[in-house]
């Protein structure tokens, strides 16, 4: 992990910013139901951000980060990776994510990412980006080469050359 479980995003909240947020369930094309946290500015912009968390999946850090993006005019949705193995309910800070991470696949993570991208497109987000951290950083690079029609991808602490049971992001893009 790149930071403690009780960390907050380094970007301060904008006092008085008008945003909406909700926990929701998305359905991927393969039938997986996944948890997601959506934050939208009350005056929608044209940019959407899919947040791809670290190995711990969806928790408060990424919910707060989605809110910070929305306060700055961007719709943001943070997804959870563990719908296939742990269900789509919310989990506490003591969640044992390790066994669930081991069961993820690139195809599953990308199906979930595509569901989030499509949800943002349904909100009229024209330019959509992925921003991922650690495990999600790698997933962000893979998303760039997976045909989601993204405007860009940012991977923080992720490796574009590491493989997880399939071609690496670099190989997918070749």
Report each predicted region and the residues it spans:
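N-terminal cap/leader regions of alpha/beta-hydrolase-fold enzymes
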Residues: 1-174
């Amino acid at each position: 992990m790149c930071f403690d479980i009780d960390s907050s995003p380094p970007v301060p909240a904008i006092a008085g910013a008008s945003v909406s947020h909700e926990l929701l369930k998305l359905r991927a094309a393969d039938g997986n139901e996944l948890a997601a946290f959506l934050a939208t500015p009350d005056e929608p912009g044209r940019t959407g951000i899919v947040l791809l968390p670290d190995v711990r999946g969806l928790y408060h850090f990424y919910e707060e980060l989605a809110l910070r993006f929305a306060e700055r005019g961007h719709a943001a949705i943070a997804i959870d990776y563990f719908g296939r193995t742990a269900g789509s309910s919310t989990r506490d800070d003591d969640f044992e994510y390790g066994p669930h991470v081991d069961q993820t696949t690139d195809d599953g993570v990308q199906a979930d990412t595509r569901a989030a991208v499509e949800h943002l497109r349904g909100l009229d987000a024209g330019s959509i980006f992925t921003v991922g951290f650690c495990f999600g950083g790698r997933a962000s690079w893979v998303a760039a080469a997976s045909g989601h029609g993204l405007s860009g991808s940012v991977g923080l602490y992720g490796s574009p050359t590491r493989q997880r049971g399939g071609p690496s992001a670099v190989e997918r893009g070749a």
